[in-house]
Regions:
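Conserved protein-kinase catalytic-loop position immediately C-terminal to the HRD catalytic Asp
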Residues: 15, 22, 99
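Positively charged, aromatic-enriched patches within helix-turn-helix-type DNA-binding elements
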Residues: 25-77, 81-90, 97-99
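C-terminal edge and immediately downstream basic/flexible tail or linker adjoining helix-turn-helix-like DNA-binding
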Residues: 103-106
Length: 106
């Protein structure tokens, strides 16, 4: 696990995923991933606190830029898309029944 600049971290690296908030890039095993702005914000949020479950509402709040009027179930669609892009490591984003989602520590 790598965190740079603890107070204002700009890069998080976990399980082969490197997400850079300043350059708005995401790499998985060295290959750049094409994420939507909402997917990027959701992944950043979950990776910034691995193991912590986030409710759909919390994830919606972090994604306000693009989907200000989203329904909670829209988050499920974004998570499904993220999981597909992270295959074969899709289990890194875990469903927490009755709560929402979390990025696992492994």
């Amino acid at each position: 696990m790598l965190f740079r600049s603890e107070t204002g971290k700009s890069v998080i690296s976990l399980h082969g995923i490197e997400i850079d908030r300043v350059n708005h890039t995401t790499k998985f095993n060295g290959v750049e991933l094409e994420l939507t702005p909402t997917e990027f914000r959701m992944l950043w949020t979950m990776m910034s606190q691995p193991g912590r479950p986030f409710s759909r509402n919390e994830l919606m709040e972090t994604s306000r830029g693009e989907d200000a009027n989203s329904l909670e179930r829209t988050i499920d669609v974004h998570v499904r898309s993220l999981r597909k892009k992270l295959e074969p490591e899709s289990e890194l984003i875990e469903t927490v029944r009755g709560v929402g989602y979390r990025f696992i520590r492994k």
